[in-house]
Amino acid sequence: NWQASGLRLDDPVKISATHIHIGNRFAFSYRDAEPWQPDPITNFNNTTIAAGLAALTEQAHDMAPAEGLATFIFPNSSLTTALPSATTEIAKIKSFVEAGHSNAEDILEPVTALIGLGPGLTPSGDDFLGGIMIALNLLEEVEKCRVLASAVENAASATNDISRAHLNAAARGVGAEPLHATIGDVISNRNHVLKASLERLDAIGHCSGWDALTGVVITLRAWLAE
């Protein structure tokens, strides 16, 4: 219980080269933290990606949470989404990824509808959009990512500071390590290790890992359809 320990809203925060100090009582060290960047993926083969997506659909079906947006990973399933209001907006975002001839104003409506949508400290809609930007970076779809990131920035006042920080990182192609591991397994069709990556992904937030993965899957499918 952080409140019982003396932590209060609006306590002053000071960040040094090795610690984060909060008020006069707490100091969190990151002295031993090491910089990390996801490994680039350079071999994009349509057949391999399609096989990886098929393996994901099979292995993730019984693992994916009912909450959030993970049911969109399984387009032909009888699973019911917990956020049906997202269906139309996700279709619009998918069309943008497939076409790519849009500007930020054209996709601002679906982005605005998704920002702040769903459960979690980083809401499901935010994580979904972050997953799309990460995937676009990996696929070197620079202009599409720039347009989407611009729309996200315009709508980001509807979410919280922590989620905005994650979205900013996603616009640069950076997410949680288990997400990148799962993406690598899918793109390279490493189905023998995919389940282990999914189990680590499952531990991210309320359902944030799955929501971000949904954005990745939507993007990969749209990319294959181009």
Q: Each predicted region: which residue ranges?
A:
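Phosphate/adenylate-binding glycine loop and adjacent helical scaffold
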Residues: 1-100, 104-105, 109, 120-125, ...
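A short glycine/serine-rich beta->alpha loop
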Residues: 115-123, 169, 199-208
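Short helix-capping/linker segments at secondary-structure and domain boundaries
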Residues: 136-147, 221-226
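Long, charge-rich alpha-helical interaction segments
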Residues: 147-157
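Acidic, carboxylate-rich catalytic segments that either coordinate divalent cations
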Residues: 178-226
